[in-house]
């Protein structure tokens, strides 16, 4: 059986190789995803300045009140919708999707679909 530490180490290694190719700018910032066992987090980052422009997670008060579980696909879709809504309010319409070394499957894919539903393009 593969140990969890080794799996996470391989994910970080994949993420570093992805980050060599993906770079967020002011015109098209980077939508970065991180997931833990119980929560999922998303940030929109301008890499030129090194600033987080918008952030959302299952820990936000808006979502904690409505979500029954924070670790399922429905919660990830709601986080995607929330970050999309916040980005549109700030004038961000196009982003580069950074899956964080995770497979584009399950919660990561649901977050992306939720962000697309809210109006983000990537």
Swiss-Prot record:
Which parts of the chain span the membrane according to its record?
none
Asked whether the keyword Ribonucleoprotein is assigned, the reply is yes
**GO CC annotations?**
cytosolic large ribosomal subunit
GO terms (molecular function) for this protein are: 5S rRNA binding; structural constituent of ribosome
Keyword presence, rRNA-binding: yes
- A GO biological-process term: translation
Top-level taxon in the UniProt lineage:
Bacteria
- Family stated for the protein in its record: Belongs to the universal ribosomal protein uL18 family.
- Relate the assembly described in the record: Part of the 50S ribosomal subunit; part of the 5S rRNA/L5/L18/L25 subcomplex. Contacts the 5S and 23S rRNAs.
- The molecule here is called Large ribosomal subunit protein uL18
Can you name the source organism?
A: Thermosipho africanus (strain TCF52B)
Highest lineage ranks of the organism? Bacteria, Thermotogati, Thermotogota, Thermotogae, Thermotogales
């Amino acid at each position: 059986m593969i140990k969890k530490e080794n799996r996470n180490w391989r994910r970080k290694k994949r993420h570093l190789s992805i980050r060599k190719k993906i770079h967020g700018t002011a015109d098209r910032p980077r939508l970065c995803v991180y997931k833990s066992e119980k929560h999922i987090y998303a940030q929109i980052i301008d890499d030129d300045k090194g600033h987080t422009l918008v952030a959302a997670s299952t820990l936000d008060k808006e979502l904690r009140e409505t979500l029954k579980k924070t670790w399922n696909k429905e919660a990830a879709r709601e986080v995607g919708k929330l970050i999309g809504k916040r980005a549109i309010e700030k004038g961000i319409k196009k982003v580069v999707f950074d899956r964080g070394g995770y497979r584009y499957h399950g919660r990561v894919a649901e977050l992306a679909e939720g962000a697309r539903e809210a109006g983000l393009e990537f």
